[in-house]
Design a protein with these regions (language model features):
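Active-site-adjacent structural elements in enzyme catalytic cores
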Residues: 1-292
Length: 294
């Protein structure tokens, strides 16, 4: 399969490119596109066969549900039923944005999209390219992260190309994403609503809008036998290709050990990345992949 790559500017959207990508989705194809969180692998959320193609392209188990993306709030009622009253307040504060909410699914959503569950995960992305594509495709686009299952989520179109070229129909290259972290998932089928996957929107932020929320046991107890209920949490996730080491100890010991390991790898001609906090970043002189704000 030839993968078509189209450049697109979110500040000046080319409607011809959007219509081309929308037609690919309407015909059952797969299109990778940018959202504010990560690049998503889009398919028609209301077609069972499109869901099967998504699972095949990603090498993703078919019982791992997909998130349905919408561009207009009124469309939520077409894919979800028994929507709780708190939803309006949450949507007013956090949609469009990096929040996925789980509801009871409507009959229009196939079980292929929901991973065989009677619930559906729904999000309204804020990226204008994503919103335009969703509308052009008919309003409902399922979109897990656009990567091979288990790999780190892509934040650029090049990440998608390297991983999925030849497996999907099209990539919309809208540049680097804004957040780089997948959406927070909130289960609205329980009382109080429960966080199933952490993300940019925190429990404190939810509490300011609707009061206290719960946190899924699997997030706070690594020995929990409870089955994860959210997309991306049931199977191995965020697994980089490179070897990764975790160094533990007091700060002085950690810094010394990490510098020694990095120096030894550098001497062997290897590229080195160090994940560090703002407190210790100044002590490292090698390539830094990510710096935590705390």
């Amino acid at each position: 399969m030839e993968t078509i790559i189209r450049k697109i500017d979110k500040n000046q959207i080319n409607q011809d490119v959007i219509e081309e990508a929308g037609n690919v989705l309407k015909q059952g194809g797969l299109v990778a596109f940018p959202t504010e969180t990560v690049y998503g692998l889009g398919a028609d959320a209301l077609k069972e066969e499109a869901a099967k193609k998504t699972y095949a392209a990603k090498g993703r188990p078919s019982d791992n549900p997909l998130i349905v993306h919408i561009a207009d709030y009124e469309d939520l009622k077409k894919v979800a039923v028994n929507i709780p009253p708190e939803t309006d307040a949450l949507a007013a504060h956090f949609w469009p944005g990096p929040l996925t909410m789980i509801f009871e699914k409507s009959e229009s959503v196939p079980y292929g999209t929901t991973g065989g569950l009677d619930t559906v995960a729904v999000r309204m992305p804020s990226d204008p390219i994503a919103a335009a594509l969703i509308r052009a495709a008919g309003g409902f686009v399922s979109a897990p992260s656009a990567n091979t299952s288990g790999r780190p989520s892509p934040t650029t179109a090049e990440h998608v190309r390297v991983d999925l070229e030849g497996k999907i129909d099209m990539i919309l290259d809208g540049g680097a994403v804004d957040i780089g972290l997948e959406s927070t998932i909130l289960d609205m089928t329980v009382e109080p609503p429960m966080i199933l996957r952490p993300g940019a929107i925190t429990a404190d932020m939810f509490e300011e809008v609707i009061g206290p929320v719960g946190v899924d046991e699997t997030l706070v107890n690594s020995e929990s036998k409870q089955a994860p209920k959210a997309p991306g949490m049931k199977y191995r996730h965020y697994a980089p290709k490179a070897k990764m080491m975790i160094v533990e100890g007091n700060i002085r010991e950690e810094i010394l050990a990490i510098r020694q390991l990095a120096y030894a790898a550098h001497r062997e001609g290897k590229e080195v990345g160090i994940i560090a906090t703002g407190e210790t970043v100044q002590f490292y002189n090698y390539c830094l992949l990510y710096t935590s704000p705390s």
